[in-house]
Amino acid sequence: MSLRVMIFNVSIFTLKCINSVEAKPVVKVTPDQRVFRGETVTLTCDIQRGGNVQWTYSWFKDGNTFYPYRTTAAEISFRADESYSGKYSCRGERSDSQRSDTSAAVTLTVSDLKPKPELTADPAGAALTGNTVTLTCRMDLSPGWDFYWYKHTLNSETKTETNSYRVKIDSVSDGGQYWCRAGRGKPVYYTQHSDALWVNVTGEREHSM
C-alpha cells in the first residue's frame, strides 16, 4: 500500500512538471501606473527565469481576458482613457504547451484631468539686469517628466530634465512673459501650459566701488 501511494504521488508530480514551468512573470508599466487620458501606455510581461525560448503571452484585465489576448511580443501598447483603469496580469506559454504562473496584478489608474503646472520665480517681483532669476515649474507628479520653457511666446521652447530654469537678466528685453509645461513618453504627452508669469526688469544692479 505504501509503495502504491508513492508511485501515485510521483505520477502527479511528473504531470505537473509537464504542464507548467517555474517561470515568474512580472508586469511592468511605462511610463507609470498613474497616467492621464491620451497618454500611450506600454505593458511588458517580463518572464523571470524564462530562459532563451519563444513565449506566447496572454493578458488579463480585472481577471478577464484582455485584447489582444495572446501575443508573441512581450509588450503591448495602447492610448489610455478611463476605461483602461484596472488590474493587469499576464502569463506565458511555450511552444511545448508549458505555461508560466500568472503574474501578480498591477493596478493602472487613468485620470481624465490634464495636469496644469504652476510657474514661480525666485526672487519674486522685480528683477535687476545682471541678476539671475530661477523659474520653477511646480507639479504634484511622479518623476520621469521633462520640462519645457517659453519666453515671450509659445512658439519656441527650451527643454530641461529638471523643473527649474535659470534666466540671466542681461537687459530689459529679458523681462516679459514666461510659461512652462511638462511632457513624457513617446509620443510625448504634454500637460497644459502654466499661467503666464511676468518677469519685470526695473534697472541695473548696483556695482560696488
What is the predicted role of each segment?
Residues M1-M209:
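Extracellular domains of the immunoglobulin superfamily
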